[in-house]
């Protein structure tokens, strides 16, 4: 069943959910099928993401959809991820920021990625 105001919810996701989409790309990197709208509504309803899609608990988002504990940390642009780590890149162009992954692009041909600079990385790894 869809929530009321789903169109406004999805518009906000389209405008601002690049980090969330990159986290879901990590969570479903094993190519399992998933319901994107369900995932977005779940993480907002649980309070791990604000209604404007600002991410508060990336570790719990990954745990929800993988069943494993995760740690997520901010690293410098020059950080080289280990084999067991997943990379999410953060680009800046003026006052605009955008998250992107090496093999997943929430916005194909993003001006922020093409014309901006790699400012930092978010590194995700399972806790063993």
Regions found by a protein language model. Give the residues of each.
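Active-site nucleophile-adjacent alpha helix/oxyanion-hole segment immediately C-terminal to the catalytic cysteine
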Residues: 1-49
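Conserved active-site-adjacent core of cysteine acyl-enzyme catalytic domains
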Residues: 28-127
């Amino acid at each position: 069943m869809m929530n009321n105001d789903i169109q406004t919810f999805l518009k906000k996701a389209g405008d601002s959910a690049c980090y969330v989409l990159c986290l879901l790309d990590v969570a479903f990197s094993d190519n399992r099928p998933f319901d994107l709208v369900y995932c977005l509504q779940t993480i907002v309803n649980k309070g791990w993401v604000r209604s404007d899609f600002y991410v508060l608990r990336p570790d719990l988002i990954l745990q929800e959809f993988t069943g494993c504990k995760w740690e997520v940390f901010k690293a410098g642009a020059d950080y080289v991820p280990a084999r067991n780590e997943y990379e999410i890149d953060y680009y800046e162009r003026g006052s605009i920021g955008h998250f992107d992954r090496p093999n997943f692009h929430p916005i194909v041909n993003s001006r922020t990625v093409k014309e901006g600079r790699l400012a930092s990385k978010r590194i995700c790894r399972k806790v063993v």
